[in-house]
Amino acid sequence: MLDAMKTESVRIQQEMAKESKSSLAGYQDLIVGQAGWWLLLKYELIMLFCSIIPGALGLLLRSIFYPCLLGSCGKKVYFGANVVLRHPHKIKIGDNVIIDDNCLLDAKGRDNDGITIGSGVFLGRNSILSCKNGDIVLRDRVNIGFNSEVFSGSRVEIGSDTLVAAYCYFVGGDHAADDVEKGLTEQGSRSAGITVGANCWFGAGVIVLDGTSIGANAIIGAGAVVTKGVADYSVSIGVPARHVRDRRNGQP
């Protein structure tokens, strides 16, 4: 997965810089993720006529036409205004989902599965789900507050019934920086992924770093930075996040 992520990062820059490749072809590769004029035309028409229309009419149009771009889409899925979809054929959404205004769902990658959103999920305004040849899985009834971001270079999974407050960042990847003789952009990226158990609560402004696993029923206090594993039922706070008590008995 590390090699795949490095390859994808470098590939995007190289593809966009090719003199032999038209700007339109580069755009289609980056945004649509599939070749073919019909697929590009369909994407452009749906986004042009549906994405920024406000009010009930916009909700209706997007609920009808956005699913035509997606890998799969359940019933009663509502897309707010200016929701942006990239590589939409790799986005799968369950039933009764709300994606608020100005969200970005970016499933790009060569051989990844992309973004899977379970039923009953709420994604708050201005939030971002971003893949770089990785996968993002939001299990049923996950609630993500506004201005939050989930990034994945391998796999980030958030368990069912988890509550994520505003301005949180799940950083499912990192830059390689081992070779001081090379520029950082030449060294690519690496990712170990993030796993979050069911029924967790993340306070506002939490940052979860790559390679961490957070157990079920855990609570992470506002502003914490999670750098290592968190046990089931743990209440953790601070920078870096440290365990302060067990929810089951109140003991450290």
Predicted ranges, named:
Residues A166, A222, D232:
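Residues that flank catalytic or metal-binding motifs in active/ligand-binding sites
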Residues A231-D232, I237-P240:
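Acidic, glycine-centered active-site loop in nucleotide-sugar glycosyltransferases
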Residues D179, K228-G229:
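Short acidic/histidine- and often glycine-rich active-site loop of Leloir-type glycosyltransferases
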Residues M1-K76, D161, Y167-C168, G173-V180, ...:
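Terminal amphipathic alpha-helical/low-complexity segments used for targeting or macromolecular assembly
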Residues V84-I93, I98-T212, V239, R247-P252:
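Flexible, glycine/small-residue-enriched loop-and-beta-strand segment within the central core
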Residues G203, L209, G221, V226-T227:
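Short hydrophobic beta-strand segments in globular cytosolic domains
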